[in-house]
């Protein structure tokens, strides 16, 4: 069961990247997106000179910050050393991936939530990042001076300033202050993006989903999967073996969500009853065939789609070496 949950957690995001073009009529279309219903991936410019609709397209994408260092980064010895891996914006959400080097060795951390474009006189002055705590959105960081430039050689560069409004330790990210000025390269979108019309599986798949049912050949159902999050191995000296016990200090998740982006990112979240995340994981996904009926997760997990629309997603996994099969059912989250 533990191995299953690891695969499930490491497979399944909340990053929603598709929008009907009709919602962005005021933005000039890019001819390169003529056959796609996905948000424009070619937008550029100074966000401070753009409307909210324009700025949303400009920041849309996965921005690799791993080669950039903040000019103002703190060097506190009492906190872990942290660096940005990437920050990705979708139409409504963002995911920030961090590398953390602490006393117990390297690990990764992720911050996910909604963002807001703040305007003055019709132009965007800042982008605010929020994180859900006990069901409330907390303003954790502010981005300003955002500029995206399309390079003559292809691709896009971005520069921006970020200021953290809270101590990251308040959301269990034990890092020194990451505020400062950064530069970033935009990661390429998945090839299927440019041909993702509204009837394509790619367009239907790229959104935020919540698991509504699960069943496998071992007899487990969704409630077992959620409970498994709080199970721990404990040694029984009488029996001389390890058994699974429920951690009394653990909050059993209420729901499980996944978000798939058109830049090949997935975000998985286990959520408490208030809708706030207990755990966030990120990774990559790709299509396994041209028909877009199979997909890979982290190059080692295959899902087989049986039903897919903009509101419902059903798929199954099978293990070639065993008789194990698991069926998943998700509904889209607005």
Go through each PLM region and give its residues:
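Sec-dependent signal peptide recognition
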Residues: 2-10
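Short, conserved catalytic or interaction motifs in soluble domains
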Residues: 19
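Lipid interaction determinants
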Residues: 22-112, 121-334
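C-terminal motif of bacterial Sec signal peptides marking the signal peptidase cleavage site
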Residues: 15-16
